[in-house]
Every structure is written in structure tokens, then in C-alpha cells.
């Protein structure tokens, strides 16, 4: 059977014209159009773009930079360079880092000892800038070297419009004199919503356990509480069911949020940046309302499911042996889609969609299936045809001979 699909769901080209605020207001919120982010992208973890809004516009990542910092550190843990249980003793220098004005942080005191895991928790919870600087210096001995590694990783991932100037995401002018010396003449990092989507997708695929940290709403260290700045977590003031991360960010350029949520096997990552004005409580809360609305509509319109099972199937009038189950993201409101088989015998679902750089449509191997009865039927038809032609020829010859023998 030939299955066909047309895509006219929420996140198609026609609805790309809707701004994030318009989409949010469709969910009964009332936000001013001026609260639109500078850039936004909604993706699945395999890089399928469900919604885009100025996805390649340059933005200030602010503290969402810490997601790259965490990725680099988790890579180090994965390669046994460091361990989550390794201890870091707080020096006077580290204490002073945590006392810088105009920075979100968690107070560190000389003589205290923290594990790398505890310092990592400070990054998504209190958005501690000091914790990321301490970790970078502890691991590489030099914050510049750590920042270099962040930028190399960005290039390897295809984040070609991204540049980091330190591990915290703060403006280098604010963290003086602890800014990376190599980057002291630079100020803020820059990226795009699309590049940060690449980062969050990669981070969650490679290290899904990081969600155990990003979904924490509170933690206690040295009798002091840390509070997660992500107000979209389920029990927070703007909480939404199924949210389990990731990171907020704030700078003079506005308010950012990298949000992730999972429902019925579909994980959706929403990245939005630079909602203005700053400072503004309205804009601060708007980042959560907008991200929540974009995420909810992704769940409303899309699902992740088994499209076709392993085994024999009729596709486009032919029988194929599908080598394994094919799972994919498909629109909920469409009962028709098209299964296409490539010249290399790869089966995939085709509809109007895009992916981030380096990602592709899921596919499975198929093989044409030999059908004995069908082949026998074709052979029988051929034989019958030959016999009929032969009979006609014989009759024609006999008629011809009879006609001309009388002459």
C-alpha cells in the first residue's frame, strides 16, 4: 500500500510567519509584540526544526554559555580526566571570584571544599558565574585554555556563528580581573538560536544524565540553599508539566532560555534569546511564557512513534522486507504521509521539514521481497500468451495454405 503525507500542521511554512508572541497569545496569554525574542528555534533532539524565528540572527547567549562549559567538563569526565567526586579547595582567589558585584553567583569561602559535581550544580541552579570560572581554572590551570576548548568544540559541532569569550557567559568587563587573558580585549560571547539548538541537542543526546542536575529546583550546600532560575520547571511559578531543564541567561541584551521537555517519547528543545527590554520583570517572565507556548504547541502538533514495523510490507505496489522498525517524528493531525524508498533501498518518511546542520531524516534498510506466487503468475501469463500467439500463427498458416493450394 502506498502511504502519502502532506504537512499543514502548526509549524509549517505558513505558520513560520507567526511570531513567538503571536503563538504565545494564541494560548490565551497577553504579551506585547515588543516582547518577541531576537531569535528562537524549536527542535527535536535529532535536530528536526519544528519552528524557527530569526534563527541565524546574532545574539548574546549570556549564561546559556554554561551549557557548553558543562559539555566540555562532561567530556573530561567521560575521558577520565576528572571525576564528579574530585574535590576543589576554595582559595582566596576563588572566594574573590564569588564576590564580584553585578553577577549571579553562590558565595564561596576560603578553605571550603566542593566536589566538581557540587560546583556543576551551581551553574544551572544559581547560575553561578564564579563556579564556572573556578571549574575552568581547576581543570585546565588556565581559563583561556578552557575557553579555547569551548570554541574548538563549537566548531566541531558546526556552530559556525558562535564564539565564546569565557566559560560563564558574562561580559568580560564585569568579571575583571578574572577574565581569560587571551580574551581580555573581547567583551561578550555571541551565537545564534540555531547554533544553540545544535549544542542542546548534542548535549542531551550524549549526556542525558545531565537532566538529573538541570531539573533540580533546589539544592543545599554548606547550609545554604541554591534555587533554580528556570521558572518553567514543573513546581515553579510559571511551571509546565514535562519540563526537566535546561538553562536561563540574562544580559543587557535581554533574557534567554534554553528549555527542554519530554512527552510520550518526544523530546522538544526550545531555545530563545534576547527578549527585551532589560531590566524588566515583564521580559524576564515572558521568556518562560513564550518558551512554554512554543513547546506546548510542538507537543500538540507532533508525535514520535513507530511509523512502520520490521517485516514484509506492500509499498507502492511492491513487496519489501523492512529490516528494522522505523521511528520518526510525524505531525499528529495528518493521517497521510509518504513512505519513499531511495535508490540505495533506504526507507524514510517524506514531508516538508528541515534539520539543523549535520542531521538527517531517519531511515531504515529495505530489500525487495521475492514473491513465488507472483512470479509463478507472471510466468503462467507469459506461457499462455505464447500459446495463444502460436495458435493464431498456426491458424493463419493453415488458412493461407488452404487458400493458395486451390489455385
Language model: regions and residue ranges:
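Generic low-polarity alpha-helical segments
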Residues: 5-17, 85, 345-351
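Active-site-adjacent loops and short helices of periplasmic peptidoglycan-processing enzymes
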Residues: 17-193, 204
Amino acid at each position: 500500500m502506498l502511504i502519502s503525507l502532506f504537512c499543514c500542521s502548526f509549524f509549517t511554512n505558513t505558520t513560520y510567519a507567526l511570531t513567538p508572541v503571536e503563538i504565545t497569545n494564541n494560548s490565551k496569554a497577553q504579551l506585547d509584540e515588543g516582547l518577541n525574542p531576537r531569535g528562537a528555534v524549536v527542535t527535536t533532539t535529532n535536530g528536526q526544526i519544528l519552528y524557527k524565528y530569526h534563527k541565524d540572527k546574532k545574539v548574546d547567549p549570556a549564561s546559556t554559555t554554561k551549557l557548553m562549559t558543562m559539555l566540555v567538563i562532561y567530556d573530561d569526565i567521560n575521558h577520565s580526566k576528572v571525576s564528579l567526586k574530585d574535590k576543589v579547595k576554595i582559595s582566596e582567589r576563588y572566594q574573590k571570584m564569588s564576590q564580584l558585584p553585578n553577577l549571579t553567583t553562590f558565595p564561596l569561602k576560603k578553605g571550603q571544599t566542593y566536589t566538581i559535581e557540587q560546583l556543576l550544580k551551581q551553574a544551572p541552579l544559581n547560575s553561578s558565574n564564579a563556579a564556572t570560572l573556578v571549574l575552568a581554572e581547576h581543570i585546565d590551570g588556565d581559563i583561556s585554555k578552557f575557553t579555547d576548548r569551548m570554541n574548538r568544540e563549537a566548531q566541531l559541532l558546526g556552530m559556525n556563528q558562535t564564539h565564546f569569550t569565557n566559560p560563564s557567559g558574562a561580559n568580560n568587563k564585569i568579571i575583571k580581573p578574572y577574565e581569560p587573558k587571551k580574551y581580555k580585549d573581547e567583551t561578550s560571547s555571541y551565537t545564534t538560536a540555531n547554533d544553540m539548538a545544535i549544542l542542546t541537542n548534542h548535549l542531551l543526546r550524549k549526556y542525558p544524565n545531565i537532566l538529573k542536575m538541570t531539573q533540580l529546583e533546589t539544592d543545599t550546600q554548606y547550609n545554604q540553599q541554591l534555587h533554580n532560575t528556570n521558572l518553567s520547571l514543573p513546581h515553579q511559578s510559571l511551571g509546565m508539566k514535562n519540563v526537566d531543564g535546561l538553562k536561563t541567561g540574562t544580559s543587557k541584551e535581554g533574557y534567554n532560555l534554553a528549555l527542554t521537555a519530554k512527552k510520550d517519547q518526544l523530546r522538544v528543545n526550545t531555545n530563545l534569546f534576547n527578549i527585551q527590554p532589560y531590566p524588566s520583570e515583564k521580559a524576564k517572565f515572558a521568556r518562560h511564557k513564550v518558551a512554554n507556548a512554543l513547546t506546548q504547541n510542538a507537543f500538540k502538533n507532533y508525535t514520535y512513534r513507530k511509523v512502520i514495523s520490521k517485516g514484509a510490507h506492500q509499498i507502492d505496489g511492491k513487496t519489501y522486507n523492512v529490516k528494522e522498525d522505523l521511528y520518526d517524528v510525524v505531525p499528529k493531525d495528518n493521517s497521510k504521509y509518504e513512505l519513499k524508498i531511495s535508490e540505495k533501498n533506504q526507507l524514510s518518511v517524506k514531508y516538508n521539514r528541515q534539520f539543523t546542520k549535520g542531521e538527517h531524516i531517519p531511515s531504515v534498510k529495505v530489500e525487495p521481497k521475492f514473491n513465488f506466487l507472483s512470479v509463478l503468475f507472471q510466468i503462467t501469463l507469459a506461457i499462455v500468451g505464447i500459446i495463444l500467439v502460436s495458435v493464431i500463427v498456426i491458424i493463419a498458416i493453415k488458412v493461407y495454405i488452404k487458400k493458395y493450394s486451390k489455385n
